[in-house]
Amino acid sequence: MRLKEGTKCILHALGFNLLLGVCTFGYFILKGNGIFTLFADFNNQQIPFNILANQAIKTGEVFWSWNIDLGSNIIGAFSFYNLGSPFFLLTLLLPAKALPYLAGWFFILKYAVAGATSCAYLQLFVKDKKYAVLGSVLYSFSGFQAANLLFYHFHDVVALFPLMLWGIEKMLVEKKRAIFAFTVFLNALLNYFFFVGEVIFLVIYFLIRFFFKSESRLKDSVQCLTEGGLGTAMSAVLLLPSVMFVLSNPSVEEKISGMGALVFDGVKYLQILRALFFPGENMSYSSCLYWGEWSSCAAYLPM
């Protein structure tokens, strides 16, 4: 059976990003005797959290675990990190103790999937599919990815986010239903925190790409709200308990007031400017402005 050009493009992007991932991470995996390690939160939180969640699900502690601090709700504690991630679900097929050896390979898989999903979206806008593959590499190996290697679960979000952009295009341009709702479901289930930012981005995207240009503004808006709402509702099995857990935290009662709610301090703007023209740095030891800076501030325009 002959593959369609679009499918071939996605497979090429998947394979190319997979190969680049192996070349990038493979050396460090081998150097670590099979284990990919970094420092700080990656070693002390990300890997232990995945091991604990894996063990909790397999032992039936799906609602509460005494192994988290003084005891905590499993869904509330880990839905931000991994519970809704398809990558984490794959690790359930393997022993929890194998996770330190799997992390590097799952990084490679996440980069490959990010390449495939971004290519699926980008190819909708180019005649020569090679440019979609090139764009997929720029996306999956972006500065955000490199700067946030420390945060293992961020890469799950990057891998699946392009699906929502692809889904909204399929819905409003090709008039294919249900695809967008499913992509919203996947992303809402994956990470409630990032999902809020993704929704804001999608609203802006819809307004610029469709609303101000389309003659069927009302119909398009209703369709987006309907499928978006349906996808969000389907994710409620994990999303709702997560939101309830967050709202029960006393910290959410604290408010940012005054100018601090609207603008950064002056040094922060210098940090953003520095990130545009200088390569990203180790988050815990910055060369200037801040001793440690954890806001994923990296762009580096020369690249």
Predicted segments, located by residue:
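Membrane-embedded helix bundles of polyisoprenyl
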Residues: 17, 112-124, 130-211, 223-243, ...
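Alpha-helical transmembrane segments of polytopic membrane proteins
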Residues: 107, 154-157, 198, 287-292
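Start-transfer (signal-anchor) and selected internal transmembrane alpha helices
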Residues: 1-30, 223, 228
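Membrane-water interface of alpha-helical transmembrane segments
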Residues: 3, 7-14, 97-100, 104-107, ...
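Juxtamembrane/interfacial segments around transmembrane helices
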Residues: 61-75, 162, 187-192, 208-209, ...
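Transmembrane helix-loop junctions in multipass membrane proteins, especially transporters and channels
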Residues: 29-36, 96, 174, 210-217, ...
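Active-site lumenal/periplasmic loops and adjacent helix-entry segments of GT-C-fold
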Residues: 27-125, 130-162, 190, 279-281
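Periplasmic/ER-lumenal interhelical loops and adjacent helix-loop junctions
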Residues: 44-53, 86, 220-221, 228-303
